[in-house]
């Protein structure tokens, strides 16, 4: 069952992490990155200017393709949770994706109140399951 993904959309901003690949690492890591982000047509690649603590950098980002039929701008929380709870993809359960994203952002000092609330609800679900379920 398809799930939901986080994506950059035009008209906003994003706090996150910028990764640098050394030139000799590009052939090793870039094909898998490109395949993961571009295989469904849900994203469009764009070079943008980013501000970092070390100064400005150009970065390749993958923004939402609003023309893709899977594009969803916003959902009520109850509907979002229902989809996430039942969905899984080639990288695992959607619940893990949401919770791990929230944990990674918190570890990087980035706090998103809505995402944190959703992740807490999903974590509570997992604690309510009987042992071995």
Segments (PLM) and residue ranges:
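Glycine-aromatic micro-motifs
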Residues: 1-133
């Amino acid at each position: 069952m398809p799930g939901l993904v986080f994506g950059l959309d035009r008209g906003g901003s994003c706090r996150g992490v910028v990764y640098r690949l050394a030139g000799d690492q590009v052939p090793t890591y870039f094909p898998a990155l490109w395949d993961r982000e571009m295989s469904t047509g849900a994203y469009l690649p764009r070079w943008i200017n980013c501000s970092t603590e070390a100064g400005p950098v150009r970065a390749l980002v993958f923004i939402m393709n609003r023309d893709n039929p899977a594009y969803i701008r916003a959902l009520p929380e109850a509907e979002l949770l229902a989809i996430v709870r039942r969905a899984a993809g080639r990288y695992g359960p959607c619940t893990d994706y949401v919770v791990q994203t929230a944990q990674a952002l918190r570890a990087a000092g980035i706090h998103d109140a809505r995402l944190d609330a959703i992740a807490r609800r999903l974590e509570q679900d997992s604690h309510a399951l009987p042992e071995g379920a």
